[in-house]
A protein has these predicted regions:
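Short N-terminal helix-initiation segments at or just after the protein's N-terminus
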Residues: 24-33, 88-94, 112-115
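Signature of long, low-cysteine stretches enriched in small and polar/charged residues
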Residues: 103-146, 153
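Secretory pathway targeting signatures of secreted, lumenal, and periplasmic proteins
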Residues: 46-96, 130-131
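Second-shell loop/turn segments in exported
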Residues: 44-46, 87-95, 114, 148-157
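N-terminal targeting sequences that direct proteins away from the cytosol to non-cytosolic compartments
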Residues: 6-11, 15-71, 143, 150-174
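Short, conserved charged micro-motifs
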Residues: 97-101
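Short, hydrophobic/aromatic-rich segments at coil-to-beta transitions
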Residues: 38-44, 71-76, 118-128
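Bacterial Sec-dependent N-terminal signal peptides
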Residues: 2-3
Length: 174
């Protein structure tokens, strides 16, 4: 419990610093030491479709995608055995839509707490969907696609910290 409290406090300080700026900037190098100090483990997964790597905490396991999932743009889905949480990674053709245009669509779709920022230098927009109890982050790509990572549930204890670490890990694959 003390390790988790240490991680929570360190991540809160990191997030407070990031949120103090006009456009929040998250960097994996800021989160990784706090996770390590707190004994929080996980591993990176690489998505070859977009040359991106994303860290998942231990206990979130890759779920095999169906043909329908793939047809709907899913390139990754992670959940614990009890299905009490999930992280989905979707890569969808939006015909070259800009991040600003995508943000406008989010507003009309009822998203809240829409916020532009950067993650490891990549421009993005984050938002929440109350009816889905989720937080998402979206990036545009040079190929005219949107990469969107959605984490749920958001309403459980420490969810924002865990999901914050997942989001902060999104980076170009080495």
């Amino acid at each position: 419990m003390k390790k988790l409290l240490c991680v929570v406090m360190a991540l809160c300080l990191t997030m407070a610093c990031a949120l103090a700026e006009e456009a929040p900037a998250l960097n994996w190098e800021d989160f990784a030491p706090a996770l390590e100090a707190g004994g929080v483990t996980g591993q990176f997964y690489t998505f070859d479709e977009i040359a991106v790597a994303i860290w998942m905490p231990e206990g979130l396991n890759p779920v095999e995608l169906t043909e329908e999932d793939v047809a709907n743009g899913y390139i990754g889905y992670f959940a614990p055995d009890d299905q009490s949480a999930a992280v989905s990674i979707v890569y969808v053709d939006v015909n070259g839509m800009s991040l600003e245009d995508y943000t406008a669509q989010l507003e009309s779709a009822g998203a809240t707490e829409i916020e532009p920022g950067t993650v490891n230098g990549l421009p993005c927009v984050s938002y929440k969907l109350a009816e889905q109890d989720s937080v998402s982050i979206a990036f545009t790509t040079e190929a005219g696609y949107i990469l969107e990572v959605t984490c749920t549930p958001l309403s459980v204890e420490n969810a924002e910290l865990v999901w914050g670490a997942v989001v902060a890990s999104i980076q170009p694959a080495a």
